Amino acid sequence: MSKQVNVNFHQTFKPECQYISSILDIADGITWRSVKDISAVTGIPQGTSSGKVEPHISYAEYMGLVKSEKQIKLSRTDLGKIIYMEDPGLQELLTKTLLHAMILRQENGADMWSDIFNSIFPKYRNGIKKELLILELNQLYANKVTTKN
Protein backbone atom coordinates (compact mmCIF):
# COMPACT_ATOMS: atom_id res chain seq x y z
CA MET A 1 0.00 0.00 0.00
CA SER A 2 1.54 3.29 -1.06
CA LYS A 3 -0.70 5.87 0.58
CA GLN A 4 -0.79 6.72 4.25
CA VAL A 5 -3.72 5.21 6.12
CA ASN A 6 -5.43 7.05 8.96
CA VAL A 7 -6.78 4.94 11.80
CA ASN A 8 -9.43 7.64 12.18
CA PHE A 9 -10.59 7.26 8.58
CA HIS A 10 -14.15 7.44 9.82
CA GLN A 11 -13.59 11.12 10.61
CA THR A 12 -14.03 10.37 14.33
CA PHE A 13 -17.75 9.73 14.01
CA LYS A 14 -19.67 6.50 13.63
CA PRO A 15 -22.07 5.76 10.81
CA GLU A 16 -25.48 7.27 11.56
CA CYS A 17 -28.46 5.15 10.51
CA GLN A 18 -30.55 8.21 9.65
CA TYR A 19 -27.86 9.50 7.26
CA ILE A 20 -27.29 6.14 5.59
CA SER A 21 -31.05 5.72 5.33
CA SER A 22 -31.29 9.17 3.67
CA ILE A 23 -28.58 8.21 1.19
CA LEU A 24 -30.44 4.99 0.42
CA ASP A 25 -33.60 7.04 -0.07
CA ILE A 26 -32.09 9.24 -2.81
CA ALA A 27 -30.13 6.45 -4.51
CA ASP A 28 -32.27 6.30 -7.64
CA GLY A 29 -29.45 5.46 -10.06
CA ILE A 30 -30.51 8.34 -12.31
CA THR A 31 -29.87 11.72 -10.66
CA TRP A 32 -26.40 13.25 -10.60
CA ARG A 33 -25.85 15.36 -7.49
CA SER A 34 -23.13 17.44 -5.89
CA VAL A 35 -22.16 16.96 -2.26
CA LYS A 36 -23.93 20.25 -1.52
CA ASP A 37 -27.12 19.00 -3.22
CA ILE A 38 -27.01 15.74 -1.28
CA SER A 39 -26.60 17.67 1.95
CA ALA A 40 -29.56 19.92 1.11
CA VAL A 41 -31.83 17.01 0.15
CA THR A 42 -30.88 14.67 3.01
CA GLY A 43 -30.06 17.07 5.83
CA ILE A 44 -26.65 15.45 6.30
CA PRO A 45 -24.27 18.16 7.57
CA GLN A 46 -21.65 19.32 5.07
CA GLY A 47 -19.55 22.09 6.56
CA THR A 48 -16.01 22.88 5.51
CA SER A 49 -14.46 20.95 8.37
CA SER A 50 -17.39 18.80 9.46
CA GLY A 51 -18.61 17.29 6.22
CA LYS A 52 -20.43 14.02 6.70
CA VAL A 53 -21.92 13.44 3.24
CA GLU A 54 -18.94 11.79 1.56
CA PRO A 55 -17.96 9.64 4.56
CA HIS A 56 -21.54 8.39 4.86
CA ILE A 57 -21.63 7.58 1.15
CA SER A 58 -18.44 5.58 1.76
CA TYR A 59 -20.07 3.82 4.72
CA ALA A 60 -23.09 2.94 2.55
CA GLU A 61 -20.74 1.59 -0.14
CA TYR A 62 -18.75 -0.44 2.40
CA MET A 63 -22.04 -1.86 3.68
CA GLY A 64 -22.95 -2.96 0.17
CA LEU A 65 -26.04 -0.74 0.00
CA VAL A 66 -25.13 1.64 -2.82
CA LYS A 67 -22.72 2.14 -5.65
CA SER A 68 -21.56 5.65 -6.39
CA GLU A 69 -19.88 7.35 -9.27
CA LYS A 70 -17.63 10.32 -8.65
CA GLN A 71 -19.94 13.08 -9.87
CA ILE A 72 -22.16 11.39 -7.40
CA LYS A 73 -24.88 9.33 -8.88
CA LEU A 74 -26.07 6.87 -6.28
CA SER A 75 -27.82 3.63 -7.11
CA ARG A 76 -29.03 0.93 -4.76
CA THR A 77 -27.42 -2.49 -4.93
CA ASP A 78 -29.64 -5.57 -4.77
CA LEU A 79 -29.06 -5.64 -1.01
CA GLY A 80 -29.77 -1.90 -0.81
CA LYS A 81 -33.10 -2.43 -2.59
CA ILE A 82 -34.17 -5.14 -0.14
CA ILE A 83 -33.11 -3.16 2.93
CA TYR A 84 -34.77 -0.01 1.56
CA MET A 85 -38.06 -1.92 1.18
CA GLU A 86 -37.91 -3.89 4.44
CA ASP A 87 -36.21 -1.50 6.88
CA PRO A 88 -35.75 1.95 5.28
CA GLY A 89 -34.80 3.59 8.60
CA LEU A 90 -32.18 0.92 9.36
CA GLN A 91 -33.67 0.38 12.81
CA GLU A 92 -33.88 -3.42 13.07
CA LEU A 93 -31.11 -5.29 14.89
CA LEU A 94 -30.87 -7.79 12.04
CA THR A 95 -30.27 -4.95 9.57
CA LYS A 96 -27.59 -3.37 11.76
CA THR A 97 -25.87 -6.74 12.28
CA LEU A 98 -25.90 -7.44 8.55
CA LEU A 99 -24.49 -3.98 7.74
CA HIS A 100 -21.77 -4.46 10.34
CA ALA A 101 -20.86 -7.79 8.72
CA MET A 102 -20.85 -6.18 5.27
CA ILE A 103 -18.53 -3.36 6.34
CA LEU A 104 -16.09 -6.01 7.62
CA ARG A 105 -15.91 -7.94 4.33
CA GLN A 106 -12.41 -8.53 3.05
CA GLU A 107 -13.51 -7.57 -0.46
CA ASN A 108 -15.41 -4.31 -0.90
CA GLY A 109 -15.62 -3.64 2.84
CA ALA A 110 -13.66 -1.07 4.79
CA ASP A 111 -10.13 -2.50 4.53
CA MET A 112 -8.83 -1.37 7.88
CA TRP A 113 -11.95 -2.36 9.81
CA SER A 114 -11.86 -5.73 8.09
CA ASP A 115 -8.22 -6.23 9.05
CA ILE A 116 -8.84 -5.17 12.66
CA PHE A 117 -11.82 -7.48 13.17
CA ASN A 118 -10.71 -10.42 11.01
CA SER A 119 -6.94 -10.51 11.52
CA ILE A 120 -5.98 -8.62 14.66
CA PHE A 121 -8.79 -9.01 17.23
CA PRO A 122 -8.83 -12.84 17.00
CA LYS A 123 -5.20 -12.86 18.20
CA TYR A 124 -6.07 -10.79 21.28
CA ARG A 125 -9.24 -12.32 22.68
CA ASN A 126 -8.69 -10.74 26.11
CA GLY A 127 -8.38 -7.21 24.70
CA ILE A 128 -5.75 -5.08 23.03
CA LYS A 129 -4.25 -1.73 23.94
CA LYS A 130 -4.24 1.09 21.40
CA GLU A 131 -0.44 1.08 21.08
CA LEU A 132 -0.38 -2.63 20.21
CA LEU A 133 -3.24 -2.17 17.74
CA ILE A 134 -1.28 0.60 15.99
CA LEU A 135 1.80 -1.63 15.91
CA GLU A 136 -0.20 -4.49 14.36
CA LEU A 137 -1.75 -2.14 11.79
CA ASN A 138 1.65 -0.73 10.87
CA GLN A 139 2.85 -4.27 10.20
CA LEU A 140 -0.10 -4.80 7.86
CA TYR A 141 0.14 -1.36 6.22
CA ALA A 142 3.93 -0.99 5.88
CA ASN A 143 4.27 1.67 8.61
CA LYS A 144 1.76 3.98 6.89
CA VAL A 145 -0.74 4.14 9.77
CA THR A 146 -1.25 7.42 11.59
CA THR A 147 -3.58 8.44 14.39
CA LYS A 148 -3.88 12.06 13.28
CA ASN A 149 -7.44 13.29 12.82
Question: What label would you give each PLM region?
Answer:
Residues 1-149:
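Donor-sugar nucleotide-binding helix/loop cap in glycosyltransferases
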